[in-house]
Regions:
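Short, electropositive alpha-helical surface patch
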Residues: 81-105, 123-137
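Short, small-residue-biased leader/transition segments that mark boundaries at the very start
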Residues: 1-5
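Alpha-helix-loop-beta-strand connector modules within alpha/beta enzyme cores
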Residues: 62-63, 134-142
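Active-site beta-loop-alpha junctions enriched in small/polar residues
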Residues: 12-14, 36, 75-79, 114-116, ...
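Short beta-strand/loop segments at the ligand-binding rim of alpha/beta enzyme cores
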Residues: 6-9, 69
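Distinct, well-ordered alpha-helical segments
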Residues: 17-26, 84-85
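Conserved strand-turn element in the central/C-terminal portion of the radical SAM core barrel
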Residues: 47-49, 62-91, 111-116
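Non-cysteine beta-strand/loop elements that form the S-adenosyl-L-methionine
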Residues: 28-40, 68-76, 106-114
Length: 148
């Protein structure tokens, strides 16, 4: 079946610092790792990582160990959750995220927005046009980018 179907794994990337996890992910055809912001505070609002030691820098350093053999996936959204504003589409957010993309050098980037209801009904989907503008900036780095 491996000759006919590609094996894909989507991971929140919180365990990729572990050698056993990294080795396993390198064995699949499409190793898709999530990173939704360049800022710890935004990631905490969006994803609520359970590890107190989670840092974007730690995830980025672990992603770099894949030497480009990964696909980076990022969800863009805006709104409010738990009384806190969240928006990873601002120029500050996108520019900082693009610097990390350039540092990680994944084989591909996938950008998308909300596609179903969330626990926070005040979160808003980002338009396809906004996602395409972000994708164009990724492609300007020489990295293919798809919009979903």
């Amino acid at each position: 079946l491996g000759d006919v179907y590609k094996r894909q794994v989507l991971s929140n990337a919180t365990q990729i610092h572990r050698d056993s996890v990294r080795r396993a992910l390198l064995r699949v055809d499409n190793n898709i790792l999530k990173l939704d912001s360049a800022f710890d505070a935004t990631v905490r609002r969006m994803n609520n990582p359970q590890s107190a030691s989670y840092t974007v820098r730690g995830i980025v350093e672990a992603m770099k160990r894949f030497d480009g053999r990964m696909i980076l996936q990022t969800m863009f959204l805006r709104g409010e959750c738990g009384g806190q504003p969240v928006d990873n589409t601002t120029e500050e957010e996108v520019s900082a995220w693009l610097r990390l993309v350039a540092e990680i050098r994944p084989q591909q980037v996938m950008v998308y927005s909300l596609d179903r209801d969330t626990p926070c009904p005040t979160l808003e989907k980002v338009t396809k046009e906004e996602l395409q503008a972000i994708a164009a900036r990724v492609e300007a780095l020489g990295i293919p980018c798809s919009v979903a």
